[in-house]
Swiss-Prot record:
Gene Ontology terms describing biological process: microtubule-based movement
Coiled-coil intervals: 350-425, 611-640
Family according to the record: Belongs to the TRAFAC class myosin-kinesin ATPase superfamily. Kinesin family. KIN-7 subfamily.
InterPro entries found in the cross-reference section: Kinesin-like_fam, Kinesin_motor_CS, Kinesin_motor_dom, Kinesin_motor_dom_sf, NACK_C, P-loop_NTPase
Pfam families: DUF3490, Kinesin
Record field: transmembrane: none
Limits of the Kinesin motor domain: 17-341
Lineage: Eukaryota, Viridiplantae, Streptophyta, Embryophyta, Tracheophyta
Residue spans of biased composition, Acidic residues class: 613-631
Protein name: Kinesin-like protein KIN-7G
SUPFAM superfamilies the record matches: P-loop containing nucleoside triphosphate hydrolases
UniProt keyword annotation of Repressor present: no
GO MF assignments: ATP binding; microtubule binding; microtubule motor activity
């Protein structure tokens, strides 16, 4: 039997009616003994008639002749019944079509006798077909069940527990945990069939000595696959099922004389057969109304066979005896209804990849032919609905446009209000032909409402040779001192960064009211080399500023002040250079003389930069030549060869930055600074800022302090409040530490917290420096070694608590840090303690990097900074176990644990993050041990609050399981974690088992995998470790996160 490709596809199927046949058995021994008369007779192969003994009036109530697809008389054998009534349907299974064969009738009418023979003949023919078609490989699977008292039981199993009937979206109705045996040969089938006969429920009644008391369903699944890919019609896997259903017979209790158990069994049998008859009757009238398939287990299991994707044959058995006339007539009525039921059988194909490709190619060719042929005009029956839909869409879009316009208007009014508050009237935009300038102004104006773009840059075009003019041009006006502590003024003038052309200097002024530190950036494009000159001006006299009170200007700026960052992105060219000039000190009288000059004076819209004279052009050329000479001298001193490619490119941004600095000293002013360690106007920035001081050895006074950047470099300017706070946090110990430090200098014998010995070199730290106990926070941080600490006394005078020391002992350069100390609160102290370890790490990095070349620092800064143990994998495992135990003790968020565990997998560069996490956890544990409160990211943490947060997170994870995982995935996870599928609150059980064992690494790894899947973590190999937040949690982060920004910036510099 060949199976064509089109037939196997069966996409639409074919409709056909159920094949109904009637088998009339002869009178049995009991009926002949009672001298019963046969009232039914087969007059031909399709008609059965009733030889009525009733009167003419009674005959008119019932039909006397019934016509079906095939009628078998008493002389017909079971072989004939199979060949002409069931063979074609049963053998459809080898063609990939589902099939079902029913035996329906009253009790003792011969149903079981008929179905046993049909089952044997069908299996024999299937095996004969398999032997004749060696080109395909066949797999036969056999299962059997019975429905006894509306309970489904497995006939191939000794377990009599009932089975559940489930609905599968692909397979339809299935029986859970039903045994399915793969047949080896014919003998194996006969053995299984004998087991089914022995397991089936039977009983004796007055009508039948061996009466079936249950409905039996024998199911055979046939799968066939082509052995070789030889022809287009032999490429797919066919899967189909044939059911042999032997129904229990309907009976009357008055005739069967049943009682007790037999009466109960008969009631269930009649009820299920009544539901079957109702389903058949409604299907015969069409499938429009409700079909009660779920009213009985029998109809629910056979739903596909009765009116779905299957070919069905029903054999109705009759008893000719007059005593059973009414039961026989009901059977014929059932058969008449079943004859009108239509099924839609389809070929069930599991297509292989090659077959799927061919099918798609054929579909593609069909679609291409349709496209190539001229399209027929589409007739739109009703255009009113389409027009209404379009009108609604237009109205919706108009509303959105109106709302966006209102939001834009409010945004512009907000900008104008802010400009009026800071004392600068709104300026109208000046139309410019330069598209880059226009785009920059628009973007900066929307993202930074306090950012004012100057239309002229000539007033700030100051070269390093004119420090007085530079200082005068950026002095703070009295009006600017009225800004709040969170207010920052950032000026950007004419941001036209043309890397290939030589253009006048472009300046940016950044003002922080806390210390009124000015940083001016001169962005120059000199031929093919872009150099960024940073001039750090002098501070305004502190005595003049202390008299003026800084107040808050508006509430929104106070909330967002710590989060506001103005980032200066690096200009990626082939060979960028950045030169930093610490300008000489200016005497207080000079400061007073120029302090009246305003910082940012509004310019009229008609102002234009003056035309350059010949003298100015010559001065610029001389300045550029001097700068090139200084750059060459710096390259020779540092022994760094910077290869340049004469190429001009666009501005690009990259998140990482490596800075290396050399020294440029000014003989007079720098010496004054070194002699005066308490000078207020010279502040060395902390490592979190965009530069780091690196002083060359031998005390030489070289030209230009320069540092080189990598091609991907990003630096950040923080706002005023966060700038001053970060500077204080980076270099200032807690107030209790200062007091005891001062006491230790005065009374060494009474000191309880001895500071770190100053004669110990930073390079002599042990390789396992991360093993140092973080609990001893009373020791002096490494970041404070060699720092002048100035403490304010009650009368306003300043007392120096230590002498100046060399900052990095590997070099002979000097960097002095001077800052004001003020009173701090307990939350500020807690925040600082966490970051002292970070400061120590960063200071070590700066100290160690000074002994490396620029090339080494740029290529692998982390390896230069870290002194790795000899066996890092073992050390990583030890640190990992310690961190996991601390996570468990401190009730750390499960999402943070999982993200950290999956992200850091033992790379040598991960030791920095392991150390930071370890110290943070030790601090939290120490705080919880003393029943104190820890402050992290602006939140107060206690042992109980962290435990409550952990329980809330577990509850949220249990909710995510319902959304993120399918039912099958959830069941697999429950089984893998030892949670029974029949238990309650399975998701909560799993959530509370996650991360519950801190010493079992398999448990930890599996917990991290589950949480990662629920939280939707991306591939950890692609994640940016530099930007990883050590406080990662389910809850949204608070707005004020300047403390975290400092940590992220520090890690990005590394």
């Amino acid at each position: 039997m060949g199976i064509g490709e089109d037939q196997m596809q069966g996409s639409s199927g074919r409709e056909e009616k159920i094949f109904v046949s009637v088998r009339l058995r002869p009178l049995n021994v009991r009926e002949r003994a009672r001298n019963d008369v046969a009232d039914w007779e087969c007059i031909n192969d399709e008609t059965v008639i009733y030889r009525s003994h009733l009167s003419i009036s009674e005959r008119s109530m019932y039909p006397t002749a019934y016509t079906f697809d095939r009628v078998f008389g008493p002389e017909c054998s079971t072989r004939e019944v199979y060949d002409q009534g069931a063979k074609e349907v049963a053998l459809s299974v080898v063609s990939g079509v589902h099939a079902s064969v029913f035996a329906y009738g009253q009790t003792s009418s011969g149903k079981t006798y008929t179905m046993i023979g049909i089952t044997d003949y069908a299996l024999a023919d299937i095996y004969d077909y398999i032997e004749k078609h060696n080109e395909r490989e066949f797999i036969l699977k056999f299962s059997a069940m019975e429905i006894y008292n509306e309970s489904v039981r497995d006939l191939l199993s000794t377990d009599i527990s009932p089975l559940r009937v489930l609905d599968d979206p692909e397979k339809g109705t299935v029986v859970e945990k039903l045994t399915e045996e793969t047949l080896r040969d014919w003998n194996h089938f006969k053995e299984l069939l004998s087991i089914c006969i022995a397991q089936r429920q039977i009983g004796e009644t007055a009508l039948n000595e061996v009466s079936s008391r249950s409905h039996q369903i024998l199911r055979l699944t046939v799968e066939s696959t082509a052995r070789e890919y030889l022809a287009k019609d032999k490429f797919s896997t066919l899967t189909a099922t044939v059911n042999f259903i032997d129904l229990a017979g309907s009976e009357r209790a008055s005739q069967s004389l049943s009682a007790g158990t037999r009466l109960k069994e008969g009631g269930h049998i009649n009820r299920s057969l009544l539901t079957l008859g109702t389903v058949i009757r409604k299907l015969s009238k069409g499938k429009n109304g409700h079909i009660p398939f779920r009213d009985s287990k029998l109809t629910r299991i056979l739903q596909t066979s009765l009116g779905g994707n299957a070919r069905t044959s029903i054999i109705c058995t009759l008893s000719p005896a007059r005593v059973h006339v009414e039961q026989s007539r009901n059977t014929l009525l059932f058969a008449s209804c079943a004859k009108e039921v239509t099924t839609n059988a389809q070929v069930n194909v599991v297509m292989s990849d090659k077959a799927l490709v061919r099918h798609l190619q054929r579909e593609l060719a069909k679609l291409e032919s349709e496209l190539s042929s001229p399209r027929q005009a589409l007739v739109v029956s009703d255009t009113t609905a389409l027009l209404k839909e379009k009108d609604l869409q237009i109205e919706k879009l108009n509303k959105e446009v109106f709302q966006l316009a209102q939001e834009l208007e409010r945004a512009y009014s907000r900008i104008e209000d802010l400009q009026q508050i800071i004392g600068e009237a709104p300026q109208q935009e000046i139309l410019s032909t330069d598209s880059e300038q226009t785009n920059t102004n628009v973007v900066l104006g929307r993202q930074y409402p306090k950012l004012r773009v100057r239309s002229s840059w000539e007033s700030l075009n100051i070269t390093p040779e004119s420090p007085l003019s530079a200082q005068a041009s950026i002095m703070i006006s009295p009006q600017s001192t009225e800004h709040g502590s969170d207010e920052n003024v950032f000026q950007l003038s004419d941001l036209r960064l043309n890397s290939g052309a030589s253009s006048p200097a472009q300046h940016l002024a950044f003002v922080t009211p806390g210390k009124f530190t000015k940083v001016r950036l001169n962005i120059r494009g000199v031929e093919s080399k872009n150099q960024l000159h940073i001039h750090k001006g002098e501070s305004v006299d502190q005595s003049r500023v202390q008299g003026e009170r800084l107040h808050e200007m508006d509430e929104p700026s106070e909330v967002d002040s710590e989060d506001t960052c103005t980032e200066l992105q690096c200009i990626e060219t082939e060979s960028p250079g950045i030169i930093m000039y610490p300008e000489p000190n200016i005497l207080p009288d000079r400061c007073k003389a120029v302090s009246a000059l305003p910082l940012c004076e509004p310019e009229s819209k008609n102002s234009r930069p003056p035309t350059e004279t010949a003298e100015e052009k010559e001065e610029k050329e001389e300045t550029e030549e001097k700068e090139e000479e200084e750059e060459e001298r710096v390259k020779e001193v540092s022994s760094v060869s910077i290869q340049t490619k004469e190429k001009s490119g666009p501005i690009k941004v990259s998140p990482r930055c490596v800075l290396s600095l050399t020294d440029e000293s000014f003989p007079d002013e720098s010496s004054n600074l070194k002699r005066d360690p308490t000078h207020q106007d010279f502040v060395t920035p902390s490592p979190e800022k965009l530069y780091a001081w690196h002083l060359e050895s031998n005390g030489q006074t070289a030209g230009g302090t320069g540092f080189t950047r990598s091609r991907s470099c990003g630096a950040s300017f923080v706002s005023s409040s966060s700038f001053s706070l970060s500077e204080r946090d980076a270099n200032t110990p807690p107030c209790w530490y200062q007091n005891e430090r001062a006491e230790s200098n005065l009374k060494p014998s009474n000191s309880k917290r001895p500071p770190l010995p100053k004669h110990i070199s930073r390079m002599s730290m042990p390789a396992t420096w991360f093993e140092k106990d973080f609990n001893h926070t009373q020791r002096m941080p490494a970041g404070l070694d060699g720092v002048n600490m100035i403490k304010s006394s009650p009368n306003g005078s300043q007392v120096s608590t230590s002498k100046s020391h060399v900052y990095a002992r590997q070099t002979s350069g000097r960097a002095l840090i001077s800052q004001d100390e003020g009173e701090e609160t307990v939350p500020q102290r807690d925040k600082r303690i966490i970051h002292l370890s970070m400061e120590e790490i960063e200071q070590k990095f700066l100290a160690l990097r000074s002994s490396k070349s620029f090339k080494d620092a740029a290529v692998d800064p982390i390896q230069d900074y870290l002194t790795m143990p000899l066996n890092w994998p073992l050390e990583f495992k030890r640190l990992e176990m310690e961190i996991i135990e601390l996570w468990h003790a401190c009730n750390v968020s499960l999402s943070h644990r999982s993200y950290f565990f999956l992200l850091f997998r033992g790379d040598q560069k991960d030791c920095l993050y392991m150390e930071v996490e370890l110290r943070r956890l030790k601090y939290i544990r120490e705080t919880f041990t003393h029943n104190n409160k820890a402050i992290e990211n602006g939140r107060t943490l206690t042992s109980m609050s962290s435990l409550r947060a952990l329980n809330r997170e577990r509850y949220k994870l249990s909710q995510l399981m319902q959304k993120k995982l399918t039912k099958e995935e959830r069941e697999n996870v429950f089984l893998r974690w030892g949670i029974g599928l029949n238990t309650k609150h399975r998701r909560l059980q799993l959530a509370h088992r996650l991360w519950s064992e801190s010493k079992d690494m398999d448990h930890v790894r599996e917990s991290a995998s589950v949480v990662g899947k629920l939280m939707g973590f991306v591939d950890m190999d692609l994640a940016s470790k530099e930007m990883f937040g050590l406080n990662f949690s389910l809850r949204p982060r608070a707005k004020k996160s300047s403390l975290w920004k400092r940590s992220v910036l520090s890690l990005s510099i590394l």
